[in-house]
């Protein structure tokens, strides 16, 4: 048993070291070196306004269309609600997007307003009407008739499962799958266009590869259920895949305004919050060590482990910390301390009844577990409700951010309280230190608490 506990301890130590290597680097050139992200209220960011082209939208449908635009943009840049991006309507035809951080790339900006609707075209015959023209010729939409209705082949008939892959030669592939209507259209069109080119367009432009040449593959066989698009760079294919899966914009967007936003709280607040947090943690550790002796010291070590793991997760997800997110982290830290106090109170009771340390540790954790589980499951349910509510309101990003940070923190706190602290205590079972009651409680046997 002691050998097993020793191996578990080494695994915990290795996890601690790994978490430190993730948390500590802030140099962007280092592995995982990007610092923890801060929200618009703490670090500033970018304020952008987009104008929607509603010229082809019936007036009675404007609200539904604009709500759809907000949803698609939110899914593109804020799928988990942890980047704290704000997407809101302004008037009838404008969308305001606020992105935290001052290092937003042009690619990230382009991701927001991109329509993400691919249209497939066939070469137009001389004298025929055409929609696109490029170096390969003039193109008209590729269409087919199903049950008397004419359809145009577009990515609107893709299933939401496109992904990026590589072929055996390492070439980038954007893999897609047709839905039922798309499969019928693709079968009819590719049967008709065997040994001819099929153009791919986005908006008014042809989809082009790294070399700038329009992508227009020759149809070598009938394509029915799925297909691939070759010639894109990895970044372009990945961005397009994400946007296709998130959904296409129902109307075109035009950027009309962009401004850098200063933080509302700023670095001074961050510095004060860090100092206050460190003072609070030190005071909690002093209390636990004074009241629970050795278990309190071990819990303090587990609390440090908890903090490092949570911060590592914040970087890996990544979570953008705002005032709301910091609040979720603090609440989860309090719950981590609360779990340890419940365990140690039970442990002390068991020791005072005359049990050995090993028996007291197992009994203490067993008796405290139901209370810890109930309180944490209740918190998880509350997080789920908050996450859902945050997704139904325009300014819900902070609510979703609070829910996610609280969920991550509480999940890690359960792990550290039940697994890490327990393993550290088990290391003392059967040792001389483990037989010294004074190291585990300020009371003596025979006295009631």
Curated annotation (Swiss-Prot):
Subcellular location: Cell membrane
Keywords: Cell membrane, Membrane, Protein transport, Translocation, Transmembrane, Transmembrane helix, Transport
InterPro entries: Acrflvin-R, SecD, SecD/SecF_arch_bac, SecD_1st, SecD_SecF_C, SecD_SecF_C_bact, SecDF_P1_head
Family matches, as Gene3D superfamilies: 3.30.1360.200, 3.30.70.3400, Multidrug efflux transporter AcrB transmembrane domain (1.20.1640.10)
Domain of life: Bacteria
One example GO MF annotation: protein-transporting ATPase activity
Main location class: membrane
Disulphide bridges: none
Keyword Magnesium set for record: no
Pfam families hit by this protein: SecD_1st, SecD_SecF_C, SecDF_P1_head
Ranges in coiled-coil conformation: none
GO biological process: intracellular protein transmembrane transport; protein targeting; protein transport by the Sec complex
SUPFAM superfamilies assigned: Multidrug efflux transporter AcrB transmembrane domain
CC terms in the record's Gene Ontology section: plasma membrane
Transmembrane segments: 6-26, 272-292, 294-314, 317-337, 379-399, 401-421
Annotated membrane topology: Multi-pass membrane protein
Description of how the protein assembles with itself and partners: Forms a complex with SecF. Part of the essential Sec protein translocation apparatus which comprises SecA, SecYEG and auxiliary proteins SecDF. Other proteins may also be involved.
Function: Part of the Sec protein translocase complex. Interacts with the SecYEG preprotein conducting channel. SecDF uses the proton motive force (PMF) to complete protein translocation after the ATP-dependent function of SecA.
Family: Belongs to the SecD/SecF family. SecD subfamily.
Protein name from the UniProt record: Protein translocase subunit SecD
